[in-house]
Amino acid sequence: MTTYHSTQNEQSSNTEESSQDAAPRPVSPSEVPADDREATQLELQPLLDPDDPRVSPLKLERIRLLKVIATTLVYVNLVLFVILLVSQFFAIPGFNNRGKSFLGLDLALVSLFINLTTNWFFAVPAYYERILGYITSGLLLIDFIVAFLVSPIRQSLGLLDLSLIAWVCLNSLFNSLIGYWVEEGKHYQEIRLTGRIEKRKTISELVIIFFKVLGEIIILWIVWCISLTLWINCFDTHEKPWGKLVPVNNNQFRVHLACFGDVHGKSDQPIVLVEGGQSTSSEAFQEWIEELHHLNKVERYCIWDRPGYGFSDSAPPPESLGIVTEYLMEALRKEKIEGPFSVVGFDIGGLYARMFASRNRAKIQSILFVDSWSPDLLKKWPFSGSGRKNESTKVFKKSLEVMDNITGFKLWLRGFVSPLGVLPNLHWFLHPMRFSSKSRIFGRDMVYLSKYIRARCQEQLVSGILSYNEIMDADINDLNVGVISSDFMIKKLLNWGKWQNEISKLSRKTSEWVIAENSDHFIWNSPKGRKELQQLLLRLIGEQEYLK
């Protein structure tokens, strides 16, 4: 009996111990995982309305971080744009590539617009905005690859513009991914707080999405235009320079210098040195001299492209008459072309010819001014001063552009649009044979090129102060001078005849002043004007007239 009671007591003791082990142990709230606590709270609270602010993806920490990054990119691109804008006025180391134009500014603006579009109503993602962003980044990636593989374009764009293309490409891709991540965060919040993904859109959201997609379409169109212009420029590289690209200014950039005939040997005839006009390249202007060369009347001649014109690279600011003339003198020294020279200058090229002659008097045989500019045209208001008659600047239309503030403002606007290449691309699309590579590089479409417009802007910035003072100090007295003027310009403009008369009196040895009849500003385009122009040049260089 004693044994039985002992066993019974042991069993009851074991039962009590096992029941104590099976009982739940109290758990502190701090020991429960945060996700489980949050899930429990969500189960206890009622589902929220989809429009409730608490459903916003910005309540998620990772989305708020993306918002901070996107906002930071706006300021980064804004600072980049300001630096690139300042580099158009001042030479900043590292920001002066050989083919410097307005492309860098446009790329910075595109990147800024992409970031602004993303930041505008950040919490409202748009699917088609994201798709367009992927297409934009793909186009820019193709641009980068093409520009990198085509050697002349790679050298022209330099590290700066190539980096900007890559930067905008990455910006577009990253902002599209931001839109995807925000949408994922939005769905996550909706499932957690409303129980389902909300597919309906409010009117305000639809309006926001519409403008976001519209903004992305505009960005894509801009990038497409830039891409097409870049691809056409790559195609145009098959058109080789006529002469040599000579490095100048400590090898910072190159100017195009092309000579025909024996310019290093001895001859009784001087080297005819050609200066083009404001909107006319030396290649286009020299055709009447080329004709004389083929007829063995002009033995040798040289043409060159000022920075930004034709085949030449862009120059760092500033670009005054004297500074550009120094580039020409350096190129001639490097090519060991010593003269003597007969300088022919058309339009504003007459001022460059005058500057070159004044700095190389011992090497100058003669100067021919072809409907040349007066220094007054370098001033903001060319009709100021004694003996000048006030007239509208519209009288210069289709002949030249004055250096006033309105023209300067228009040039800058044209500059910002120029990387899109709308008109040249349209010309190429409609008339590919008529508007060929030659037309874009040094022909009629040259005036739409971004580097040309930038050169004009640089020329305009210092024209009224630096260039004007330089040309007024230029002395060509006692040099043999010939002047030919358009009768059309003299009859049309109140001051043109007086300006041409003043040019004819720059030297005591002015041999002739010829009025080309039935000729507009571009004298060589009319048969009679071309004949008079050629005969005058032949007389200046000591040759017999060959046309009767």
Question: Positions of the model-derived regions?
Answer:
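A short loop-to-beta-strand scaffold at the N-terminal edge of the catalytic core in hydrolase folds
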Residues: L245, N250-D262
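Conserved hydrolase catalytic core segment
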Residues: E338-W381
